[in-house]
């Protein structure tokens, strides 16, 4: 059995982090409109799903070359915005949880087994 190395990313969030700036602006936008009352975790998760569907719709019945990049940017921004707001609701650091997930995936998908294949980790 091969031993997997645990390569771990170091998290280095500065006060000028793009994620922190985006969250600050999103919360300011939300709070100016008194919308926090509607932004409970359930509804934020539903909004992510709906906006993800709208993003998918940009590709429906088209090749990726025919997709409208302007619309893709808008829908992707919505998905990201609701994701950041949901993370904030739970006090989660978006960059930190992304890096944690990458580390988990490194263990599930070692390069020597997963390179060049789309197989799921339990089929490698």
Q: Which positions does each model-derived feature cover?
A:
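Flexible "arm" and connector segments at domain edges
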Residues: 2-76, 80-124
């Amino acid at each position: 059995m091969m031993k997997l190395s645990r390569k771990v990313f170091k998290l280095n969030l500065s006060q000028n982090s793009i994620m922190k700036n985006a969250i600050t602006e999103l919360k300011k936008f939300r709070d100016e409109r008194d919308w926090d009352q509607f932004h409970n975790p359930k509804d934020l998760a539903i909004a992510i799903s709906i906006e993800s569907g709208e993003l998918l719709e940009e590709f429906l019945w088209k090749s990726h070359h025919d997709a409208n990049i302007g619309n893709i940017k808008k829908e992707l921004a919505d998905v990201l915005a609701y994701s950041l707001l949901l993370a904030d609701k739970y006090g989660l650091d978006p960059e930190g949880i992304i890096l944690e997930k990458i580390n988990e995936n490194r263990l599930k998908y070692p390069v020597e087994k997963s390179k060049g294949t789309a197989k799921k980790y339990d089929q490698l």
